[in-house]
Amino acid sequence: MMSTLFPKLSIKKEDTLPALAISELNDWALITMIGNDKKSYLQGQVTADVVTLPQDDITFGGHCDAKGKLWSIFQLFNHNDGYALFQRRSAIETELTEIKKYSVFSKVDIAVGDDVLLGISGKKATDWVNKHTTTDANVRACELGTFAKISETQWLLVTTPEHKKNIINQESNTVLCDESLWSLHTIQHGLPQLDNALSNAHIPQAMNLQAVGGISFAKGCYTGQETVARAKYRGINKRAMYLLSGQSNSIPVAGDAIERSVGENWRKGGTIVSAYRFEDGYTLALAILPNDLEEGTQFKLQDSIWNKGNQPYSLDEE
């Protein structure tokens, strides 16, 4: 059922995006982690370097199985007296089970948070956050809750139902819309995310986690590290996440298969990670594809031809 407070925003390809918009992020959730052993426990589980993460900063990270396949992709930051791992809700149940698997041996409490998650997006998002905070850090605790910078045009606010109500009442001149606009910003910035349809299927480098600072190759051991390291030093990874564009009749969803041209034929070429469809049918998507594609390779989805674009970052590892 569509929210009347946060309605879908009708946008065409040529339209200018709202300079400031607020969305409730119902398709996202937090896993929270508190307790004396939270830092050491998480350090041994994920690709990011938790030990060196500053109190007021945020980092991408991934949680893998022993073979290096991802259970989750998250953005990690300090929240209240512990950690928050911001990730897709569809994969949260599986991830909670996996991340808690060895917690019985540590003083750590892991749960799915019940906070309200608001997404502040647009070129004026940082200006809006600045009005409510007193620092210029990437993570800011304030009266409203915790702000975390997701990208140059996206801020997450972890807050309460009461603060959400007050914000809606006070922001009469701000665009309130559903979270599809948030998804568009995420895709434009090339940010990886992992829904349940992609769970336990890909290694971190196949989803560009190294390109967004989500893998530390200097930290100690963690689950799946051997595979992740071999992908870097021995070149065993054969996939990466790319931006695609084309026409669609309906919005593609995570896990949808894409075909690619091979000579005069078509064969399975990749998998959708996330997508946004404009009102005129023009669609942007992030997709996992082979990383050795020939120049000019075309793609097909929903019987339409799609083309590969450029990501806003380099995929080359140092």
UniProtKB/Swiss-Prot annotation:
It is found in: Cytoplasm. The keyword tRNA processing applies. GO terms for cellular component: cytoplasm. Folate binds at residues 28, 182. Coiled coil: none annotated. Folate-binding protein involved in regulating the level of ATP-DnaA and in the modification of some tRNAs. It is probably a key factor in regulatory networks that act via tRNA modification, such as initiation of chromosomal replication. This is tRNA-modifying protein YgfZ. It comes from Aliivibrio salmonicida (strain LFI1238) (Vibrio salmonicida (strain LFI1238)).
